[in-house]
Amino acid sequence: MPIQQLPLMKGVGKDFRNADYIDYLPVNMLATPKEILNSSGYLRSFPGIAKRSDVNGVSRGVEYNMAQNAVYRVCGGKLYKGESEVGDVAGSGRVSMAHDRTSQAVGVNGQLVEYRYDGTVKTVSNWPTDSGFTQYELGSVRDITRLRGRYAWSKDGTDSWFITDLEDESHPDRYSAQYRAESQPDGIIGIGTWRDFIVCFGSSTIEYFSLTGATTVGAALYVAQPSLMVQKGIAGTYCKTPFADSYAFISNPATGAPSVYIIGSGQVSPIASASIEKILRSYTADELAEGVMESLRFDAHELLIIHLPRHVLVYDASSSANGPQWCVLKTGLYDDVYRAIDFIYEGNQITCGDKLESVTGKLQFDISSQYDKQQEHLLFTPLFKADNARVFDLEVESSTGVAQYADRLFLSATTDGINYGREQMIEQNEPFVYDKRVLWKRVGRIRKNVGFKLRVITKSPVTLSGCQIRIE
């Protein structure tokens, strides 16, 4: 009687709308490539969230300030250094953040506001007219960054970007402040730094600028590097993030159907699977522009997290040797969007903001709950052929014993890849029972094809691997 191994990293089913085969991605579960009990890896629940502190509002942005060795976070109308308030921030939308030796800068409401470490607050503006220095049309700030002692910001709706003065960072450079990304006539959507380059992200190109080293008064300090230009654009200001020693971004619909790419030496390489591209394609250009990307690292996982209005998608670079490995994060027992955002390593823990409430949280690896609420974890197996066969002993390896009370795993089967039948409840966790078996002894007779869904609702961490069945 043959025993068949079933992978859990990605299920396969059908879309009832168009009869296409689709991927059923793990929900709230991360794949870990590690040899465990005849399996090439296992799946582990995404760390839970515990409350850390009350704040002024929902999270709007975060940055680790190396000058102060502290995390600066914008929540609601306040700027926080660690858990203490250090300033007021106008508006309610996402903000761009950068820092210097003397100040923490926030790009908000079209202005570049500098919260200096001595307690004063300055807004970048032109030099006084009687100074004799060039007066610039500064316009509205869209995105900010910093490189080599200067802040740089992009002017909203234009292809211009500016740099601050070396001596007084609250004013543009007195001689050569303005530069243009001339391949982006529709305007610079975002700006960032990579190694020693200023990176300007447009809707159809990504342009790099490097220092010229000029010391002559009035000479250009930055010059475009056409050899590094990328013929893809980003969907929105925050649809980019440093990742894997480069940048990852969601492409703009102006260059074709949106996807997720990583830049490398003037080229882009896609990391999105067909199912991820289907999800991105379900959004309009305006909805996609609201996306936020961030990177997170823990326990050898290199995660790229994409926050979209209706989905939170996670790409794990460490598990993608045999193809891109994605999963979905969600909150609650239905399809509510994942609530945590703005992850950052702080002290010896990972802290996060919140999209729904005025709190900050911290990731805890000994729970899978979010603010003491149970979460749902879903895994799927691919469809496989079992023509006129009887199926017994569906078993999953589970790391048990850490639950505070007996948890059940819900197993259901599909024969068409669309509809899953009645759920079978199996105890999968119990306090101090560390070798508990998760076993469905009699599955039934299969006419043609079959696939399985595993569902766990718990506050405890979930670790599953090695799904197998016996076929007669």
PLM features: residue spans?
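Beta-sheet repeat architectures centered on beta-propellers
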Residues: M1-S103, Q231-S246, N252-E472
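Beta-propeller and closely related beta-pinwheel folds
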Residues: P47-V58, S84-G93, V124-V292
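Residue-level signature of beta-propeller blades and closely related beta-rich strand-turn architectures
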Residues: G77, G110-Q111, G157, S204, ...
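Hydrophobic or amphipathic alpha-helical targeting/insertion segments
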Residues: M97-G132
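Residues that form or flank phosphate/diphosphate-binding pockets in enzymes
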Residues: G107, F201, A389
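Short beta-strand segments and strand-loop junctions that repeat across beta-rich extracellular domains
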Residues: V113-Y117, S154-P172, I206, V312-S320, ...
